[in-house]
Amino acid sequence: MNPAMINKIKKMQRDMLEAQKKLEQSIFTGTAGGGMVKVEATGDKRIVNIEIDSDVLNPEDKEMIQDTIVAAINDVMRKIDEETQDVMGAFTGGMPGFF
């Protein structure tokens, strides 16, 4: 390989690592139940906050609350996956299976 190509590859690697680090530090929000439950997670899929509207804290609705929390977590994970695909896809040229 010629030196220009090697430098280009190294720059792309640095840019990818920076983009990945930025994604990991980003906060994503997922909601469910019309905003009754809000889940925040980092780009590396760590849940950092869960907010539950006090109007839904009825012990008789335990199953509904649990389902809504699961839906909010799934929503935020989907958003993280989509953003990761969008950001990192720029580096892989849209090749499937890399991120």
Segments predicted by a language model, with ranges:
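Long amphipathic alpha-helical segments used for membrane anchoring, targeting, substrate engagement
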Residues: 1-29, 78-99
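Residue-level signature of catalytic and energy-coupling elements of molecular machines
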Residues: 9, 45, 69
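N-terminal intrinsically disordered, cationic/polar leader segments
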Residues: 28-35, 39-51
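A short interface-forming secondary-structure element
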Residues: 50-62
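Short, residue-level hotspots on alpha-helical faces of the histone-fold
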Residues: 67, 71-75, 82
